[in-house]
Amino acid sequence: MRKMLAAVSRVLSGASQKPASRVLVASRNFANDATFEIKKCDLHRLEEGPPVTTVLTREDGLKYYRMMQTVRRMELKADQLYKQKIIRGFCHLCDGQEACCVGLEAGINPTDHLITAYRAHGFTFTRGLSVREILAELTGRKGGCAKGKGGSMHMYAKNFYGGNGIVGAQVPLGAGIALACKYNGKDEVCLTLYGDGAANQGQIFEAYNMAALWKLPCIFICENNRYGMGTSVERAAASTDYYKRGDFIPGLRVDGMDILCVREATRFAAAYCRSGKGPILMELQTYRYHGHSMSDPGVSYRTREEIQEVRSKSDPIMLLKDRMVNSNLASVEELKEIDVEVRKEIEDAAQFATADPEPPLEELGYHIYSSDPPFEVRGANQWIKFKSVS
């Protein structure tokens, strides 16, 4: 009898030492999924669009929440490191636009392709790279995803082609990637992203034309965050209906602050392209909390009240959180646990990114070729042999 009482006492003692939130989460029965109504997309040259209701599973909801929180916290840490002068040079943050990168990835396959402009940190993460590799790239360290030589604008991963610094220049490249998919007979699509500021570039319309002529599996995606650097879309474009810019290419305008809207629209667009109908255009209406880059305080051309209103009414992370809690897909305590885990991951990555060594000077010309070239190149010094690996 004494042994039994002692055993019961040990069990109760162990339970009492666990955080109350963990005990609550472990004992609570959550719903496996829930159905939500989402905003209808505006359509151009399409008879029907994505569904206006969608099912979110508990598993997917927790995954999306963690990914968006990771992108948010990673960008805030980048802001901090930049202000400490540990990150130098160009740095464009995407906090506020997390539903775009996470939602797009949720709507495609890992074998599909993606190319974007210089606001690329979130996409680099959703394409499969770690926070460690991204922050180390921002700080110019050897452990970065581009060996510390690409920085904020030039990050790469498998089936992810950057990170491109020239405004709009990635759009023809995206059409070329889609051409390769079709030429090689692969059931793959290419997501080609650009901003509202780049939407007026002539090369974009040339890419539209070629993609339509050859019926390429290319999803042209305009991330409309309302401002091209410091110029509002109304001052920069005679028409702000970017989803209609393809003219002969079908298009849809999507609530880019709602991850479920983005996911369903991406699934719809990808299915359209895979069916052989050619390209399609998506406009994601979103918002960036930071300025254009770290050199832009972001409040000279918009008010602090405007930013705060978007944060309070349309924040993508809060929208998903409210849906999950109100539908019994998760509890507030469980999501707080995820927040704590994400913060720890970011801090660990930041420590690595500040302690990892910088690449040696002799490796400056390395990693240009995919395999070691059988020749020497005359550089600033003597004849040197470039290497593809270090």
Curated annotation (Swiss-Prot):
Q: Where is the transit peptide?
A: 1-29
Q: What is its biological role?
A: The pyruvate dehydrogenase complex catalyzes the overall conversion of pyruvate to acetyl-CoA and CO(2), and thereby links the glycolytic pathway to the tricarboxylic cycle.
Species per Swiss-Prot/TrEMBL record:
Homo sapiens
Instruction: Kindly list the GO CC terms recorded for this protein.
Output: mitochondrial matrix; mitochondrion; nucleolus; nucleus; pyruvate dehydrogenase complex
Does Phosphoprotein appear among the keywords? yes
Kindly report, in one word, the top-level EC class recorded for this enzyme. oxidoreductase
Give the record's disease field.
Pyruvate dehydrogenase E1-alpha deficiency: An enzymatic defect causing primary lactic acidosis in children. It is associated with a broad clinical spectrum ranging from fatal lactic acidosis in the newborn to chronic neurologic dysfunction with structural abnormalities in the central nervous system without systemic acidosis.
Report the EC code(s) recorded for this entry. Answer: 1.2.4.1
One GO MF annotation is: metal ion binding
Q: Which residues bind pyruvate?
A: H92, Y118, R119, A157, G165, V167, D196, G197, A198, N225, Y227
The alphabetized UniProt keywords are: Acetylation, Carbohydrate metabolism, Disease variant, Glucose metabolism, Leigh syndrome, Magnesium, Metal-binding, Mitochondrion, Oxidoreductase, Phosphoprotein, Primary mitochondrial disease, Pyruvate, Thiamine pyrophosphate, Transit peptide, Tricarboxylic acid cycle
Single GO BP term: pyruvate decarboxylation to acetyl-CoA
Provide an example Pfam family for this protein: E1_dh
Residue positions where N6-succinyllysine is found in the record: K63, K244, K277, K313, K385
Tissue specificity comment: Ubiquitous.
Q: Which CDD domains match?
A: TPP_E1_PDC_ADC_BCADC
Subcellular localization: Mitochondrion matrix
Q: What is this protein called?
A: Pyruvate dehydrogenase E1 component subunit alpha, somatic form, mitochondrial
- Reactions catalysed: N(6)-[(R)-lipoyl]-L-lysyl-[protein] + pyruvate + H(+) = N(6)-[(R)-S(8)-acetyldihydrolipoyl]-L-lysyl-[protein] + CO2
Please name the InterPro entries in this protein's record: DH_E1, PDH_E1_Alpha_Subunit, Pyrv_DH_E1_asu_subgrp-y, THDP-binding
Resulting phenotype, S300A: Abolishes inactivation by phosphorylation
Activity regulation note: Pyruvate dehydrogenase activity is inhibited by phosphorylation of PDHA1; it is reactivated by dephosphorylation.
Entry comment on modification after translation = Phosphorylation at Ser-232, Ser-293 and Ser-300 by PDK family kinases inactivates the enzyme; for this phosphorylation at a single site is sufficient. Dephosphorylation at all three sites, i.e. at Ser-232, Ser-293 and Ser-300, is required for reactivation. Acetylation alters the phosphorylation pattern. Deacetylated by SIRT3.
Q: Which cofactor does it need?
A: thiamine diphosphate; Mg(2+)
Assembly information from the UniProt record? Heterotetramer of two PDHA1 and two PDHB subunits. The heterotetramer interacts with DLAT, and is part of the multimeric pyruvate dehydrogenase complex that contains multiple copies of pyruvate dehydrogenase (E1), dihydrolipoamide acetyltransferase (DLAT, E2) and lipoamide dehydrogenase (DLD, E3). These subunits are bound to an inner core composed of about 48 DLAT and 12 PDHX molecules.
The gene from which this protein is expressed is: PDHA1
